[in-house]
Amino acid sequence: MKLTNIITGMLLLAAPCASGQQTTPQDAQPVHTATIYKKGDNGFDTYRIPATVRTKKGTVLAFAEARKHSRSDTGDIDLVLRRSTDGGRTWGDIITVWDDAGNVCGNPAPVVDRETGRILLLSTWNDGTDHEKDIHARTAKDTRRVFVLYSDDDGLTWSSPREITPSVKREDWT
């Protein structure tokens, strides 16, 4: 009997969720959608690993890996971004944050210092000929390394990458 009461109570509580009715708060704003990165645009085969952040000035920065020749994790991969100064309604041209010839610059992780406005971008690098399985097996030419870049002008320009691998990556990590 106790189990029946519990199941009945759960069904009664779940009923409004299953009714198909949706409620919208009075102050809800409509969501605007936009395609920021599209396969084949700007000479890149594929864009992956998106990351977004809103700057102290309110600019939306949308980072991605721009994969030049395929969607593969190996090869010539650049870190790019697009900026929006109107909350995401329109987007500026692609800005290349980091291009290291045929190597992999990826995994963007942006952070904004709310006091100074500086945008920090953590990222990884690996040799463009190294495959993921080889990196994990520790048979690759090089290892995956960690870098930081920064912008003090709301994402318009970026510092050169500075390697921080020894201070953030344990020896047993790939």
Please describe what each predicted stretch is.
Residues 2-9:
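Sec-dependent signal peptide recognition
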Residues 3, 18-19:
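Intrinsically disordered, low-complexity Ser/Thr- and Pro-rich stretches
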Residues 8, 20-23:
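N-terminal targeting leaders only when they are immediately followed by extended low-complexity/repeat-rich tracts
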Residues 10-18:
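Hydrophobic h-region of N-terminal signal peptides that target proteins for export
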Residues 22-174:
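Asp-box/BNR beta-propeller blade signature and adjacent active/binding-site loops
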